C-alpha cells in the first residue's frame, strides 16, 4: 500500500505520517517512510513552471524507490507527493499560461511520467492562521511558501481535489493519528479479503 499525506505547510503532515508509521510498525507491518521533496530539494527557488519541472524530475526518480519498497511488501507513507506540486505551483503556472485550464492540462501532461500513484490520499486540513503559528514555532524556512496569503491560496487548491480521507489538522494530534490509523487498518484488512 502506498499512502500520500498532503496539506499546507504547518498542517501536521509529518506528525501524522510519523504517528501512523509508528503505529503500523507496532502492529507488525513493515513500513517505509519517505517525503517530498527529497533531500537537497527543499530550498529550491524558481517560478511555478521551473519548480513544477524540478519537483516532477525529483519525483520521477523517487517513484522508483517507492515502487521498490511496495514490491518488497512494505507500506509506503510519503509526506507530500504529486498534489503538493499542483497546489503550490498552480498560481505561477496559470500566470505563465495566462489561463487556468491550460495550467491544469500542462501539469497533467508533465505528470504523465509519474506512474506510481498513491492507493490512499490523505489531506490534512488546517486554517492558515494555525499553520502560521506552527511554522513560527518551528522556525520559518521558506518565506516564499510559508506566508498566510500563499497558504490560503494553496489550501483552496487542495480543497478542490478528491480525497480518500480528509483530516481536521486543528484537532488533538493523538486523536487524529489514532482515527487515521484505524481507517488505514480497516482498509488493509479489507484488501486482504
Swiss-Prot record:
Pfam families assigned to the protein according to its UniProt record, in alphabetical order: Thymidylate_kin
Family annotation (PROSITE patterns): THYMIDYLATE_KINASE (PS01331)
EC number: 2.7.4.9
InterPro entries found in the cross-reference section: P-loop_NTPase (IPR027417), Thymidylate_kin-like_dom (IPR039430), Thymidylate_kin_CS (IPR018095), Thymidylate_kinase (IPR018094)
EC category: transferase
Binding site for ATP: 7-14
GO BP term, example: dTDP biosynthetic process
Protein keywords: ATP-binding, Kinase, Nucleotide biosynthesis, Nucleotide-binding, Transferase
Coiled coil: none
Record GO cellular component, one term: cytoplasm
Catalytic activity from the UniProt record: dTMP + ATP = dTDP + ADP
One MF term in the entry's GO annotations: dTMP kinase activity
CDD domains with a match to the protein in the record: TMPK
Protein family: Belongs to the thymidylate kinase family.
This protein's name: Probable thymidylate kinase
Protein's gene: tmk
Amino acid at each position: 500500500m502506498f499512502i500520500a499525506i498532503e496539506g499546507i505547510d504547518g498542517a501536521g503532515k509529518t506528525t501524522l505520517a510519523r504517528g501512523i508509521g509508528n503505529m503500523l510498525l507496532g502492529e507488525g507491518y513493515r513500513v517505509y517512510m519517505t517525503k517530498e521533496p527529497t533531500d537537497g530539494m527543499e530550498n529550491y527557488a524558481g517560478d511555478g513552471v521551473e519548480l513544477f519541472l524540478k519537483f516532477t524530475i525529483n519525483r520521477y526518480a523517487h517513484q522508483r524507490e517507492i515502487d521498490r519498497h511496495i514490491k518488497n511488501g512494505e507500506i509506503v507513507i510519503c509526506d507530500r507527493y504529486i498534489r503538493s506540486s499542483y497546489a503550490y505551483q498552480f498560481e505561477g503556472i496559470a500566470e505563465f499560461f495566462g489561463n487556468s485550464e491550460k495550467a491544469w492540462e500542462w501539469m497533467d501532461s508533465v505528470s504523465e511520467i509519474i506512474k506510481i500513484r498513491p492507493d490512499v490520499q490523505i489531506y490534512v486540513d488546517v486554517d492558515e492562521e494555525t499553520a502560521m503559528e506552527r511554522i513560527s514555532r518551528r522556525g520559518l524556512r521558506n518565506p516564499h511558501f510559508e506566508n498566510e496569503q500563499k497558504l490560503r491560496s494553496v489550501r483552496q487548491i487542495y480543497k478542490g481535489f478528491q480525497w480518500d480521507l480528509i483530516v481536521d489538522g486543528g484537532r488533538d494530534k493523538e486523536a487524529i493519528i489514532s482515527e487515521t490509523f484505524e481507517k488505514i487498518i480497516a482498509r488493509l484488512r479489507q484488501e486482504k479479503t
